[in-house]
């Protein structure tokens, strides 16, 4: 897969922010290709262990498939109701699955935690995973991607992310064709 120039720009901005500022958020409109951008970022970060968290099973499989197309040489694994495989350099899971005590205690130290649909991250299940993973590696970075950074319940994402590396609005996508 070849990224578009604007996607390459997002990748560069996000990697720079992760390396210099720590926890980083990418806000991009629906249709931008956030999964492709995120997969490229993970591949270029070259972390020993990355945990990729989704909120739905369909997204777990979709994100895993896209990741494997972009990064065919990076070993992946999945932790879900049927599989408990933590061996991959990139581990894909749902928040509801990983937040269970039995699954959390098997989690290896993570260097990069990626949260798809990051507006969900202020919920208890996500915070439980982040807090546990941070006890295993206090230097773990958290990268989030979302089209909608605002939550209806008023909880802020600022407790997790201290900066937003890039924002891509729908108007920009329309103008670029």
Stretches with model-predicted labels:
Residues 95, 117-119:
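Conserved Walker B
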């Amino acid at each position: 897969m070849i990224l578009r120039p604007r996607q390459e720009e997002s990748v560069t901005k996000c990697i720079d922010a992760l390396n210099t500022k720590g926890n980083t958020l990418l806000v991009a409109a629906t249709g931008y290709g956030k999964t492709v951008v995120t997969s490229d970022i993970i591949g270029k970060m070259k972390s020993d262990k990355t945990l990729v968290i989704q909120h739905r099973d369909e997204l777990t499989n979709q994100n895993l498939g896209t990741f494997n197309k972009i990064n065919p040489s990076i070993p992946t694994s999945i932790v879900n109701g049927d599989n408990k495989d933590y061996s991959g350099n990139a581990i894909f899971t749902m928040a509801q699955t990983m937040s269970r005590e039995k699954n959390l205690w098997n989690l290896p130290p993570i260097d990069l935690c990626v949260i798809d649909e990051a507006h969900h991250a202020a919920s208890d299940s996500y915070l439980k995973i982040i807090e546990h993973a941070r006890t295993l590696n206090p230097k773990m970075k958290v990268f989030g991607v979302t089209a909608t950074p605002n939550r209806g319940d008023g909880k802020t994402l600022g407790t997790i992310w201290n900066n937003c590396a890039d924002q891509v609005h729908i108007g920009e996508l329309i103008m670029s064709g």
